[in-house]
């Protein structure tokens, strides 16, 4: 198995990317190989700094980089030898089993939609992220940014995608799916959330427990939290800020430490034909390492095949 990394993606690339890749290669030894994609002239000297064993990592050379500020679609189309474009081609051809990048988020979404494409039957892929539960374990929230406006049918599908990830990757036998809303009652919320509630309620593929509120986010009420990308992104950034506040105030707490984005490393794009993960632009070596390990976990669990089978029916 091969897990690929865009070595040129992120604010601290390629240094942080290479360091994270070396850490991941050590932790995945005997399970999967880490493949670096990017400027070989920059990557090789950095690998050498990490010792002889690091120099054995495979490097796929590229000559272009999609910068953070570039227009995603235009850059992806014009820079076909960029680390992101090449990464997606390797993923689509089956040469690697997962592709991770802390680079341009928009370009990662463009590549997901136009190179590997959505699973037949999926209206719109979603970006997911993770919610540490107070009593231990992890929940999943989606969408967190790919789709600011959603149709009820899209929210229903997010419930299915999240439930499959929770079951097959997180190991939750019967994931509880909750719809983020402004009240628990069935008739609460916008026209979209009310309609989505009715669809989720009768969906045979999920265990829907009804509406949940913001205060339920971190408890065990729901394992899968469904929302549109606008709401999900606000929730995600707010949760990340809680960790930042704790750190600035010098407060150490095991639970709040789990809100640190580094612990999971990245956000999977669910509903596409291959495994792709988007990392934080400020990703550290630890975050890069955990993103690659998450890529391995997704590939090992066969989550894409599970999604394809579900949406085939």
Where are these regions (language model features)?
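N-terminal glycine-rich anion-binding loop in soluble enzyme alpha/beta folds
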Residues: 13-70
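Glycine-rich phosphate/diphosphate-binding loop of Rossmann-like nucleotide-binding domains
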Residues: 15-16, 28-35, 41-44, 148-210, ...
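Phosphate/nucleotide-donor binding subsite
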Residues: 52-96
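Glycine-rich phosphate-binding loop
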Residues: 90-109, 184, 188, 193-256
């Amino acid at each position: 198995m091969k897990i690929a990394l865009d070595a040129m993606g992120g604010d601290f690339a390629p240094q942080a990317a290479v360091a994270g890749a070396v850490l991941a290669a050590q932790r995945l030894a005997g399970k999967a190989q880490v493949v670096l994609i990017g400027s070989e002239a920059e990557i090789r000297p950095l690998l050498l700094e990490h010792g002889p064993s690091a120099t054995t990592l495979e490097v796929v050379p590229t000559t272009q980089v999609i910068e953070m500020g570039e227009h995603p679609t235009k850059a992806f189309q014009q820079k076909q030898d960029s680390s992101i474009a090449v990464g997606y081609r390797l993923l689509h051809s089956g040469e690697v089993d997962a592709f991770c990048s802390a680079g341009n988020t928009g370009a990662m979404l463009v590549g997901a939609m136009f190179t590997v494409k959505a699973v037949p039957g999926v209206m719109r892929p979603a970006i997911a992220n993770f919610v540490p539960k107070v009593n231990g374990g992890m929940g999943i929230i989606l969408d967190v940014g790919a789709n600011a406006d959603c149709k009820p049918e899209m929210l229903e599908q997010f419930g299915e995608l999240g439930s499959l990830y929770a079951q097959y990757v997180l190991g939750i036998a019967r994931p509880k799916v909750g719809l983020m809303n402004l009240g628990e009652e069935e008739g609460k919320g916008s026209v979209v959330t009310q309609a989505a509630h009715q669809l989720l309620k009768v969906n045979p593929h999920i265990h829907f427990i009804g509406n949940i509120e913001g205060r339920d986010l971190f408890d065990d009420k729901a394992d899968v939290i469904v929302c549109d990308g606008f709401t999900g992104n606000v929730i995600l950034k707010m949760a990340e800020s809680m960790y930042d506040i704790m750190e600035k105030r010098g407060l150490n707490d095991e639970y709040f430490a789990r809100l640190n984005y580094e612990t999971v490393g990245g956000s999977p794009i669910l509903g596409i034909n291959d495994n792709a993960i988007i990392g934080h632009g400020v990703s550290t070596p630890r975050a890069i390492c955990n993103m690659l390990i998450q890529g391995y976990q997704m590939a090992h669990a066969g989550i894409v095949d599970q999604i394809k089978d579900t949406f085939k029916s």
